[in-house]
């Protein structure tokens, strides 16, 4: 039934029936291999393409010979700390040849710092960890289409798409004429282009295409007689208005399609063309040839005669991946070509005798191109670091968006839909919900990328009905030709199929065939899904929509204080944690010399020592806590590749995103209405779902026009009680507990000089500068935040730290919070069963089992049937049995425990086979009427925490334009009282409430100050004034040339004043600065949907770290 399997240091009992024939590849090799290719091959290709650069006379020649990468200046951790880029200097060996004198100069030229990939497959850019997402684009090649004209006639098209260069399109009309469009211009008869290629006479053309009737029809429309006329005709279409000559026409056509500098099919385009058109053009010819054009037209004629078939552009054989290496190469190419222009110009301007390669080469465009790519490309994303699975998935993400890809608005249904060629290549489940659905996917578990950028899936070869252990990787095109059996087809011991008819896939169809007809067999049942999906047990019993939510929500699980691997797993947990890079691995066999919370020292068998420093309480990109702890003891033997320290969300080397909790499916007093969750106080007390969150705050002392700012403990008008936790520098001490409004870094800024009286000037003269006016601009804990100070970092110019221009000192303070689970937090299981905590109840009031154990979570049974995610019920049953047996189980996707296995395991554990039991009401002790399903389910706490969302405003900033309060937590905004809310007040005649909401609480600038004054002084609240929006309305009408005036009831004109003097005075007295809105100046009005940083950004890691560039870096 089930058997033990060793995963890391732990045993899991697996229900799998299918032997694994192929180990899963390293899960982040898609990133690493691509970047390695770039360093080894990609750069070399770029320099080879651009070299040699000649000046316009051909006298000076600049050649790039070789390049090398130096050592990075700082280690990865130090780069994060100092906010610098993890990069190594790129040096290029350049040779300058003067052909007149024969003089040769060689020099090594520095070409800027090149960002390096870390061992985890990420980049550190300006101290932030980023990931370059792979892009799915249309492959270069030739594509055929057919559609039906409104008249009912079939019309055909063919398009030759290069990697870069002009498109060549053939199309037919209703009368079977064939036309050609060159580079999206007006169409010409196709024979004109063929004639221009050198097939001058009608006879030659007819012979070339075996006297095809469509060609004959087209020739009748063609009014050119010779190759020269044809060239001129094409030139007229491409360059209307310029006088055509045969020579200029010939060189234009040459440049468009036959010049390697202007037209590039790339290696993959040549491969696709040769394969599609059965050509044997050499693979290093990356431009079009005459044969290509003729063959592509010939193929289209075949299609018109009813043979062959049109291409499906959503097929993965026609879409390829651009990974990091290629994206970088394209960016580098842009930089180099800009540099090439500069070099050419400098060759002509400068004196030939004193010229050196160093003088010619300007590296700025190259550096700027790379910087721009990493800093602001759509595909360079701020890494989602919520937990290890989120990191791993982000690195394996495939996006159809980005430069050269699709846009959300233009992408239709077909592009987003699941396609049969996705099988084993791209996960059909894991994709975001929302506008990006189907445009962003995830690489399947066993998928790999071939040198052409196509995704390959592995299959076992089948010979005459016998399955071998030979593994072939097939691209989507190759797979179309074969019949592929499922991984779970029953086999005999020697690998023959048992059944007489086998289920198989052939292209888009499912077939039932004899064993001899089978060509290949799947290597594993989980090869069609991604990592996140493969972590869902009983996936086969869940509806796809809920599985999608389950896969996405696992990536939002917060790392908990105490981790606990699931009782019911899928066997993928170990591999996912190991490859995510958050754990520490032993590099060689050896013995542990020392294992402390700080570091682990291992003595290898060859006698060398290796020290692994552990990461302690660092802040992740998402503010969760990164902490590593050793799981080996002193003198323990370790093997190469063994996990020796756990990272966040891992438990003994296994991914552990949540906790195993005892749940019951029952309603309870309406507290689990609409997916709400009722939990026991035990989960709070025993820190089941407590997580650590670390926030970073920074203060910098700059040079201002009035003098430098100063970080100091000496702050004006602040009592000693406020300064108690600051050290002598004015920076908070580590370990201090702080809450809203406390000073973290004391800082003063010089105020503008005021007119001094004679006495003050005398004091100044005697006591020097001391009496200068400064104002308090200290860094304080923001509204709603609190915690303990865990780290303080100080960077100064004197210590040689690299700081932004104008900054003299930078202080970073890290505040950690322990967040217990609370009402309003979002929780979820792995099956898309999500909900919000509605009540935390005393342990003694929870329903309890016959043996007295109180239930920990109560879920609504109505959440199951309509959602069709029965996997959660199966997991609950099996979890109960696992707990009773004291085992951890693995039920791999599509190859896990069957219903009978679950019942058998429950029996073995001595539990009722139904998985149900009598529960008793904790308040009365009475049994509930019916038996209730109870058991252990793995439940996660998600990164949508109520502490981050709850928000209240008293007095805050107003928008400069409308003078109304801003919106959203990030802006410390107010709650919008909208149209419908106004109706509600109108309906009940609440006139005064309505009046103050529309005036003093909103945009009546004068009234707000007077009201504040009245409240402070304890007087009655005065009449409100005119709201700003009313003034704006009048101004708008006046700007349309309408004479609008405001009259009172007795027809007297009312003067609408601007903010008057006494208001400004009052404001000053009350300490309200009207011009610098409280508490922070207004930056902008947030657009709709972006009103704060917490709108559900379930997908695509948000780029919340804007990049800064110096102007001179950009060209």
UniProtKB/Swiss-Prot annotation:
Q: Which Gene3D superfamilies match?
A: 2.40.50.100, 2.40.50.150, 3.90.1100.10, DNA-directed RNA polymerase, beta subunit, external 1 domain, DNA-directed RNA polymerase, subunit 2, domain 6, RNA polymerase alpha subunit dimerisation domain, RNA polymerase Rpb2, domain 2
Matching entries from PROSITE patterns are given as:
RNA_POL_BETA
Give me the Gene Ontology terms describing cellular component.
DNA-directed RNA polymerase complex
Its recorded reaction(s) are: RNA(n) + a ribonucleoside 5'-triphosphate = RNA(n+1) + diphosphate
One GO BP annotation of this record: DNA-templated transcription
Any Pfam family? RNA_pol_Rpb2_6
According to its UniProt record, the EC number is: 2.7.7.6
Enumerate the SUPFAM superfamilies for this protein: beta and beta-prime subunits of DNA dependent RNA-polymerase
For region Disordered, the annotated ranges are 1084-1115
GO-annotated molecular function = DNA binding; DNA-directed RNA polymerase activity; ribonucleoside binding
CDD domains, sorted: RNA_pol_B_RPB2
Acidic residues bias: start-end ranges = 1088-1115
InterPro entries with a match to the protein in the record: DNA-dir_RNA_pol_bsu_ext_1_sf, DNA-dir_RNA_pol_bsu_external_1, DNA-dir_RNA_pol_su2, DNA-dir_RNAP_su2_dom, DNA-dir_RNAP_su2_hyb_sf, RNA_pol_bsu_bac, RNA_pol_bsu_CS, RNA_pol_bsu_protrusion
Alphabetically list the UniProt keywords: DNA-directed RNA polymerase, Nucleotidyltransferase, Transcription, Transferase
The UniProt function text for this chain reads:
DNA-dependent RNA polymerase catalyzes the transcription of DNA into RNA using the four ribonucleoside triphosphates as substrates.
Subunit structure comment from the entry: The RNAP catalytic core consists of 2 alpha, 1 beta, 1 beta' and 1 omega subunit. When a sigma factor is associated with the core the holoenzyme is formed, which can initiate transcription.
- Family assignment? Belongs to the RNA polymerase beta chain family.
UniProt name for this protein: DNA-directed RNA polymerase subunit beta
Q: Which organism is it from?
A: Desulfitobacterium hafniense (strain Y51)
Q: Which gene encodes it?
A: rpoB
């Amino acid at each position: 039934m089930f058997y033990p399997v060793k995963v890391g240091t732990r045993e899991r009992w697996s229900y799998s029936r299918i032997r694994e024939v192929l180990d899963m590849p390293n899960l982040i090799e898609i990133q690493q291999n691509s970047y390695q290719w770039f360093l080894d091959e990609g750069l070399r290709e770029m320099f080879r393409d651009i070299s040699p650069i000649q000046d316009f006379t051909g006298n000076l020649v600049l050649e790039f010979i070789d390049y090398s990468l130096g050592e990075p200046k700082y280690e990865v951790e130090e780069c994060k700390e100092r906010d610098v880029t993890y990069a190594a200097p790129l040096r290029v060996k350049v040779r300058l040849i003067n052909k007149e004198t024969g003089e040769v100069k060689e020099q090594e030229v520095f070409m800027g710092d090149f960002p390096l990939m870390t061992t985890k497959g990420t980049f550190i850019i300006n101290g932030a960890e980023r990931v370059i997402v792979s892009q799915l684009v249309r492959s270069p090649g030739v594509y055929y289409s057919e559609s039906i004209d409104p008249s009912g006639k079939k019309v055909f098209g063919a398009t030759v798409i290069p990697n870069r260069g002009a498109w060549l399109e053939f199309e037919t009309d209703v009368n079977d004429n064939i036309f050609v469009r060159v580079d999206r211009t007006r169409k010409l008869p196709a024979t004109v282009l063929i004639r221009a290629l050198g097939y001058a006479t009608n006879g030659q053309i007819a012979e070339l295409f075996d006297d095809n009737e469509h060609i004959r029809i087209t020739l009748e429309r063609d009014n050119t007689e010779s190759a020269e006329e044809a060239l001129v005709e094409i030139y007229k279409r491409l360059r209307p208005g310029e006088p055509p000559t045969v020579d200029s026409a010939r060189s234009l056509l040459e440049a468009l399609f036959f010049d390697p500098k202007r037209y590039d099919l790339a290696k993959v385009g040549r491969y696709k063309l040769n394969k599609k058109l059965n050509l044997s053009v050499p693979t290093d010819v990356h431009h079009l040839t005459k044969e290509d054009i003729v063959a592509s037209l010939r193929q289209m004629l075949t299609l018109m005669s009813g043979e062959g078939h049109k291409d499906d552009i959503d097929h993965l054989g026609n879409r390829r991946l651009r990974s990091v290496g290629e994206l970088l190469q394209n960016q580098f190419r842009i930089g180099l070509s800009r540099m090439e222009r500069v070099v050419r110009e400098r060759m002509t301007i400068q004196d030939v005798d004193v010229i050196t390669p160093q003088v010619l080469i300007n590296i700025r465009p190259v550096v700027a191109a790379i910087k721009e790519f990493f800093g602001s490309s759509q595909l360079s994303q701020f890494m989602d670091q919520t937990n290890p699975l989120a990191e791993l998935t982000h690195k394996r993400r495939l996006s159809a968006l980005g430069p050269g890809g699709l846009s959300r608005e233009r992408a239709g249904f077909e592009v987003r839909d699941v396609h049969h060629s996705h099988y084993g290549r791209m996960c059909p489940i894991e994709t975001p919900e929302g506008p990006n659905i189907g445009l962003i996917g995830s690489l399947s578990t066993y998928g790999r990328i071939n040198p052409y950028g196509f995704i390959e899936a592995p299959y076992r070869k089948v010979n005459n009905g016998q399955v071998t252990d030979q593994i072939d990787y097939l691209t989507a095109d190759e797979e179309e030709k074969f019949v592929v059996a499922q991984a779970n087809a029953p086999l005999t011991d020697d690998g023959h199929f048992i059944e007489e008819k086998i289920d198989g896939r052939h292209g888009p169809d499912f077939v039932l065939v004899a064993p001899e007809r089978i060509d290949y067999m799947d290597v594993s049942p989980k090869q069609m899904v991604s990592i996140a999906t493969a972590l869902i047990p009983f996936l086969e019993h869940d509806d796809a929509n809920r599985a999608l939510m389950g896969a996405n929500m696992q990536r939002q699980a917060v790392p908990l204080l105490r981790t606990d691997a699931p009782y019911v797993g899928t066997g993928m947990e170990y591999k996912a944690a190991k490859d995510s890079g958050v754990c520490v691995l032993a590099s060689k066999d050896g013995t542990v010399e020392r294992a402390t919370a700080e570091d682990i020292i291992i003595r290898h068998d060859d006698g060398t020592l290796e020290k692994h420093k552990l990461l302690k309480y660092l802040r992740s990109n998402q503010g969760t806590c990164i902490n590593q702890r050793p799981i080996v003891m002193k003198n323990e033997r370790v093997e190469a590749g063994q996990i020796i320290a756990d990272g966040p969300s891992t438990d003994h080397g296994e991914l552990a995103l949540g906790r195993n909790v005892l749940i019951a499916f029952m309603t309870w007093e309406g507290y689990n209405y609409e997916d709400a969750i009722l939990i026991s106080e035990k989960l709070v007390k025993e820190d089941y779902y407590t997580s650590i969150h670390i926030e970073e705050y920074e203060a910098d002392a700059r040079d201002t026009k009035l003098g430098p700012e100063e970080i100091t403990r000496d702050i004006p008008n602040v009592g000693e009680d406020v300064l108690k936790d600051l050290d002598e520098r004015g920076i908070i001490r580590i370990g201090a507990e702080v809450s809203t409004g406390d000073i973290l870094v004391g800082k003063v800024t010089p105020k503008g000089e005021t007119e001094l009286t004679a006495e003050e000037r005398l004091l100044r003269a005697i006591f020097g500068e001391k009496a200068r006016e400064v104002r308090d601009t200290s860094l304080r804990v923001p509204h709603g935040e609190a915690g303990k100070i865990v780290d303080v970092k100080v960077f100064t110019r004197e210590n040689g730290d690299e700081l932004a221009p104008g900054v003299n000192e930078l202080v970073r303070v890290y505040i950690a919070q322990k967040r217990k689970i609370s009402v309003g937090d979002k929780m979820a299981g792995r099956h898309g069963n999500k909900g919000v905590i509605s009540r935390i109840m005393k342990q003694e009031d929870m329903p309890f089992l016959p043996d007295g154990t109180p239930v920990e979570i109560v879920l609504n049974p109505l959440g199951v049937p309509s959602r069709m995610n029965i996997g959660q019920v199966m997991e609950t049953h099996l979890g109960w049995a696992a707990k009773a047996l004291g085992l951890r189980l693995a039920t791999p996707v599509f190859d896990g425990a069957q219903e009978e296995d679950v019942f058998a395991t429950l029996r073995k554990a001595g539990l009722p086979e139904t998985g149900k039991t009598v529960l008793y009401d904790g308040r009365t002790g009475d049994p509930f009427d019916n038996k209730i399903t109870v058991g252990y389910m793995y439940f996660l706490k998600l990164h949508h925490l109520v502490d981050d969302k709850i928000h209240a405003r008293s007095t805050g900033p107003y928008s400069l334009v409308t003078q109304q309060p801003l919106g959203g937590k990030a802006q410390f905004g107010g709650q919008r009282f909208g149209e419908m809310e106004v109706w509600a007040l109108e309906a009940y005649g609440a006139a005064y409430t309505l009046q103050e909401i529309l005036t003093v609480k909103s945009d009546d600038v004068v009234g707000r100050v007077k009201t504040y004054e009245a409240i402070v002084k304890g007087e009655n609240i005065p009449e409100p004034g005119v709201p700003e929006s009313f003034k704006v309305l009048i101004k708008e009408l006046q700007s349309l040339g309408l004479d609008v005036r405001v009259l009172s009831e007795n027809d007297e004109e009312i003067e609408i004043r601007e903010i008057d003097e006494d208001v400004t005075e009052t404001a000053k007295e009350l300490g309200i600065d009207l011009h610098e809105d409280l508490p922070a100046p207004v930056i902008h009005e947030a657009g709709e949907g972006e009103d704060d940083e917490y709108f559900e950004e379930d997908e695509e890691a948000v780029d919340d770290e804007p990049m800064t560039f110096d102007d001179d870096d950009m060209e």
